[in-house]
């Protein structure tokens, strides 16, 4: 009985303390709501609110990104504050959120000068200290340069073209036997096999299957609530990261023990760099494996999903790719000129990247008090350049939530389009952007010319923190005769 009374007293005391904290916070918020705009104007901060204690407005952001209207979080605040730049509180940090394309362009172009990359600690724990999102300064520029060199146009044209087609054909051969597949899961494994070959010179094998299995837990952790308790999705992801790093470390040791064996991959290039430690190499390789397969595999899935819901676009895609087959005299290897001739396919790719929003935005931290347009952002504040908000903005894209690849027919050169940033920008522009486009185009060509399909589930995507389909887009395949 005494124990029960003691427990009740503890619970009661905790409840009173919590209510007291909430009361103090509520009073502060009432005062803040009366004066926040005046204070922000004095500091030249945008208008806004920090939301609830601890969680801020993270839940509102999460709810929006898991709905079929991912821009709702932005829309609500743009109306409330009459501004497309506002103050919020996300993932434990006060932040300036921007859906203004000019503001975002300035943030991206001034990486290293006024801003530096800043991501939530839970994500950084998965990426590691030396993933490309985590490093700064000279090391970031060096690692980014190595990745760009690996994926230069000459390699895409003469190496990747053939390797991608071989892998896609061999993968689709296995799909024929299955009849029914979850496209999202199959694309993940296929693209991960491609990246494993380019980064670690690994062909599909038991080793790559083990890596793929570990990447399931690793990737799930990236899109999970970061609760580090035994058995949680996040904890499993951290364990998967540990095992993946161990595998890469063992490969490094094996390369050093057998220097006479020649490999043509990124790991060989990194081992030639005396200034790069093994720890940096492991984190860098793991990040590229993750980033290199995530965008491409998800884009493949979403492209097929969008085409499935738009018969007119699918018919035009079939016509374009059937014409390529006819000109080549059947299912022969595509060459670079064939790829460059896929005009409507590029429209489909652009629209898939716009509507799929595979890189929602970038987090940056101010290195000093920084003036952007009419805002003065204090040193140490987080800035979230919400790139996908522009992609889904009715001001820039008519019927923005509708899949309409024809909107790109007169605007296929998107290299200088600040309203379209699927691969980020500035010094951290994704080094694999051209590879992702090539992979997607070749996959679409082979898939569409070989198969008819029937979708087995109707589901809307979730966009938090990365776009995905919870059921994996299950489908039944039929050989196309």
From Swiss-Prot:
GO MF assignments: abieta-7,13-dien-18-ol hydroxylase activity; heme binding; iron ion binding
PROSITE patterns named in the record: CYTOCHROME_P450
Residues at which heme binds: 430
EC number: 1.14.14.145
One family name in Pfam for this protein: p450
Catalytic activity: abieta-7,13-dien-18-ol + 2 reduced [NADPH--hemoprotein reductase] + 2 O2 = abieta-7,13-dien-18-oate + 2 oxidized [NADPH--hemoprotein reductase] + 3 H2O + 3 H(+)
Principal cellular location given in the protein's record: membrane
Domain of life: Eukaryota
Co-factor requirement: heme
Tissue expression: Expressed in young tissues such as flushing buds and green bark tissues. Lower levels in mature needles and bark.
Activity's dependence on pH: Optimum pH is7.5-7.6.
Cellular compartments per GO CC: membrane
Keyword Heme: yes
Any Gene Ontology biological process: sterol metabolic process
Annotated localization: Membrane
Membrane topology: Single-pass membrane protein
Keyword annotations from UniProtKB, A to Z: Heme, Iron, Membrane, Metal-binding, Monooxygenase, Oxidoreductase, Transmembrane, Transmembrane helix
Induction (UniProt): By methyl jasmonate.
Transmembrane segments: 2-22
UniProt similarity note: Belongs to the cytochrome P450 family.
Role this protein plays: Multifunctional and multisubstrate cytochrome P450 that oxidizes the respective carbon 18 of abietadienol, abietadienal, levopimaradienol, isopimara-7,15-dienol, isopimara-7,15-dienal, dehydroabietadienol, and dehydroabietadienal.
Protein name as catalogued: Abietadienol/abietadienal oxidase
Source species taxonomy: Eukaryota, Viridiplantae, Streptophyta, Embryophyta, Tracheophyta
